[in-house]
Amino acid sequence: MNKASFVSLTFCLIAVALTGHAQQAPGSAEKRLLPVPQQVSFTGNSYVMDDSWSVSTVQVPAGDQALLNLVSELKARFGISLANKKMGMPKGKSVILKIQPGAVNIGPTTDTNRTALKKQAYRLTLTKENITITANAPQGLFYGVQTMLQSLQVFKGKTYFTTGEIVDWPDMDLRVIYWDDAHHLERLDAMKRIIRQAAYYKISGFALKLEGHFEFKSAPSIVEPYAYSAKEYQELTDYAKSLYVELIPFLDAPAHIAFILKHPAYKDLRAFPNSNYDLSVVNPKADSLILNMMDDLFAANKGGKYVVFSTDEAYYTGKAPGDKKRAAELGGNGKLLAEYVTRIGNQLHKRGRNAMIWTEFPMKEADMNNIPSHIISGVYNSEWAATIKAHGMRQMIYTSTQGVEPLFPTYYPLAPKELFKDSTKATDDEEQQGTLAKGRVGEMLAEINKATGEKKSDFMGVFVAGWADAGLNPETFWLGYATGAAAGWKSNGVTTSDLTSRFYPSFYGRTVQMDSVYRLLSTQAAFWGRSWLWKPSNNRSPIFGYSEAVYEVPKPAKDQTLPALPLPSVTDLSLPVNWNDNNEVLLNDAENFLKENNDLMRLLNENMFAVDFQQYNLQVLRTVALLCRQNLQLLLDLKSVNTLLDAAAKTAVSNPSIAVALTDQALDIVKRVRNERNNVWQAVTATWYQDWFPKVAEANGRTFLHQVDDVKDHYPDRTIDMSYLIYRQLKFPLGKWAEDVLKVRNQFAKQHNLPGRTENFNWESTKD
């Protein structure tokens, strides 16, 4: 700061001290708000909130959740203790909570259910002496509190608010995020924290997929070692409801249920006897299984209105031998699936649930008229939209913050680049999600704006998915969850950069270049994924089929590997090829990405001390950076191995002793790589297990049946424990290669009367 600026700032501070303690806000209050409010007007003047403030209520009961949340969150986030005054207008500085039906008018909305939207509307008025939150109903009051909390900012040890006014309401009623616990399970206290975080972003629905992580009374054999009991599930349901979040049960059918059909007790319900992917849609016993499981979930989810009856990717409905006759009678595979949806959907409706389904292939547009209008279309299809609306069905907009990306969502895409000439092409369904050119946030916003802009459907909300297929930690999904749901609150006039930049201060508080952290994590994870090539593999059972058809003969799955290191000659340690030359582009990229990883680790460490909130989230982000770093170091260590072996070959004739010593150094690197890999994996596991129950074969008197999905090759399914994170390294035959090099080394040493060496590389072990 130059001298003139310092004098000017000093004068301003003195002037502020003489004029009622107002000062320019240390940062824009409006730019910390997510979702983006409908109407905002801030003055720019900021004042301190501290323990001298109180809270007063008007027509708000003592146990109202908005009041409780205000008091608890101010204390937890900012260390402010508000005195709770009696009802009525306060004296002195006070936060005033008011419920007054009809007090807040709402503007135009996409959702036609304006009654529901009015209940969520609020007005937040901030003045020097009072902050007043007025709402038509308790839900709106709660949302006004969340906005007020987001608007506060810590600066030099004090908490500031900015004067002004916000009038706000949602564009659509339901803002659902999908939490996928198919391959892991959060501890109960962690799940409550997650739900509380969702409520902070005005997320109103939490679709929770548990698969075997729920204690199904009707299907006890599928229950995994760690699972929520009915009591715990109801506890989560009630907790979510208190925060105006509906916990929505999620169950797949007829497809995506290997977690059920892999068990011997249910093999007779399969559509195909040699596939655990989907069940028969013409078997009454299969209907009973799904409905009984639904009943188990509903009994522990009292008060719920919705259920996700996920008909996702039911590719083979009508193609199984037992299905064909009924499909022909109805006039097609889509009509058979529509009949199944109708049959199950009607039963769910009788149980008081509105079912969301995937309106997609093999169903066709005409099949929509065969589905009951109480069914909710969970996937927007522009071509079918008018038919669905005319039929009386309501519509959700499906979008996703994560598909099959490794380690971290593609918030910022990495430009495509071919690193291997002989890598298997990406032809399978999950590898065709594209490059996500706009990044996850941009793609979500574009999808939502496109759908609502077409005005073809009776929209009721957005559904933001975060898939567990690739085994990511869902802590990495929050940027997408918060911004995707925010676009369901307001998308008109909102930009990708605006949503993203609002997320960081609202989620973390004070940060250091957090956007750079997310950019680097995105590109680091993308390089982690493409730095290994894809090859057919026999590490698991073959794949039964894909979206278009069942394979005549199941095809091998694919795994990632690296080009094999060359084996030295016994005679003179010469190498048949130079591994470094053949992989020059890969290794150059690895060196560059390691430099960027250094920047990433520095920023993460700085933010661990800088942020006000979400320290655990940063710990998880750091584990992602560590996994990327370990991969980069492995690649560069392989470069060093090749360099040492090349040097050994060049000195083998003139100085055998030096050549053997160089070979030993190369083998020592392999041992070090293994140890560093295991150390990183153990650190990652320990961090993730702070929130997760351990992934184990046995616990609580239950055993996990480890059998992979016959169609979907989800990496977390490859192993029982957390070693799926390093699975490709465990299967890369570097240990076998090192053993072969050791044999060559000892034979060469013997020829030159040099000592032998014994070693157990134990490459595939994750233990020290």
Residue ranges and their predicted role:
Residues 1-29:
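Bacterial Sec-dependent N-terminal signal peptides
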Residues 23-172:
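Contiguous, structured surface segment used for ligand recognition
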Residues 33-36, 41-43, 51, 90, ...:
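Substrate-binding groove of N-acetylhexosamine-processing glycoside hydrolases
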Residues 37, 64-77, 145-155, 190-193, ...:
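Short, Φ-rich (hydrophobic/aromatic) sequence segments
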Residues 56-64, 98-103, 136, 181, ...:
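Structural motif
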Residues 63-64, 185-187, 213-217, 254-258, ...:
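Flexible loop/turn segments at secondary-structure boundaries
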Residues 73-77, 200, 242, 350, ...:
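Residues at alpha-helix termini
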